[in-house]
Amino acid sequence: MERYTYEVTFTRLDGQPDEIQQHTGEELARECFRLFDEPDSAEMYSKIELSRHDWETGMDEILETMTF
């Protein structure tokens, strides 16, 4: 099992539950995160966050945040 899991979390404006995409590779997670760095994302989301979970320590770390 990989040591890290990366998550892109989309906080929705409509009050529905957050959408979460999980990735095992940082490069793919960052690519997905960057795809939403555009003005149209502000119409659906209040925030998009890229985080990393360390399975050895159990710690979560926020790597990047976009706030609209």
Label each PLM-derived region with a short phrase.
Residues 9-11, 23, 51-53:
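Predominantly extracellular/luminal cell-surface or secreted proteins
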Residues 14-16, 27-29, 56:
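Residues that cap or initiate secondary-structure elements
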Residues 22-25, 66-68:
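Solvent-exposed serine/threonine-rich low-complexity stretches and specific carbohydrate-binding patches
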Residues 1-16, 45:
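Short aromatic-glycine-(Arg/Gly/Cys) micro-motifs in beta-strand/loop hairpins
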Residues 38-68:
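Short, mixed-charge low-complexity intrinsically disordered segments
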Residues 6, 29-32, 64:
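N-terminal leader/targeting signatures
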Residues 23-47:
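A short, charged, amphipathic alpha-helix used as a generic interaction element across diverse proteins
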